[in-house]
Amino acid sequence: MKFSLIFFSNSYPEEAGGAYAVISEMARYGDRHGFEAVWIPERHFHTMGGIYPNPAVIAAYLASITTNIRLRAGSTVVPLHHPASIVESWSVVDNLSHGRVDLALASGWNVNDFVLAPSAYPNLRELWFERIEEIRALWRGQPVNYPNGAGKATPIVTYPRPLQAEPNLWLTATKQPESFRRAGELGMNVLTMLAGISLEQLAQKTARYREGRRSAGLDPDTGTVTLMLHTFVHEEIETVHRSVRGPFLDYIKTSLMSHLQGGAVDVGRQLSAQEIDQMAEYSFERYFSTAALFGTVAETRKFALAAREAGVGEIACLLDYGPSVADIRANLPFLAELKHSFETVEA
């Protein structure tokens, strides 16, 4: 089992050094302690994650302060951007990082994000898969035809050329089993989360992924399913509860409001504050026991082993969902111990 670090939400504006101090510190820590990668999201127009409008820009900075850790778009919303723009930006990062770039490619879901590309929203899934193939071709240096300003089809080759001949690609997939199969058929990895499902249900989706790889003539046992999990590991379970309960409840409420405003959830009416509180409490209890990496090293190891049985090959540890920076720092040595326990057994 591999372990990486992923960021998604909180800007920690109170930190000295500004909004990006936390991700910078955690990326350095991950680099020193052998974590696989740091994932940088793309988020727009909301306090939750709004400091990450362009993951390539942040990755370019992280390239200058790290040496070994992979730098991953987690995720780039493909229908919002021209494929050539995606490849140009990340090729710069690939050069700056000496070939450490990987890309997770998402379809997008928040209708408000598509003020950046309103014509793309009605057929975003079709554009998603169409542009994935264009991104691959452009990365390889193959010309792709696009209409120029006069409407004439023009073959384009992007520069600078990336250092890696082939991009390592993840398909961001959560709810649709068919997306897992499609990722397998395309020879991509998968970035996913437990969005209202159990590990047992995730296992059914990872099986679809393996079926997709097999049907495409690929080794079904290769390819990585990466699972994002809210993470807090500590030697004392009481410290885990104290550190995550309040921040995680606030995180759930903010996330719920983002989904309501973005059109991903439609309940047909405006929810009351009491209803939102009740939903947050229910979600917290479910997440804590069945859908997060919360607990001692021994407890989280059991969960990670269960995830591996469900077909997961990497856990992306979400850190910035609300715990204080001091608490996040306090959890890191235990998270590193958890990671090391798998390296020792698997070596």
Name these PLM-found stretches:
Residues 82-188, 200-203, 207, 214-216:
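Internal, glycine-rich beta/alpha segment that forms the wall or movable "lid"
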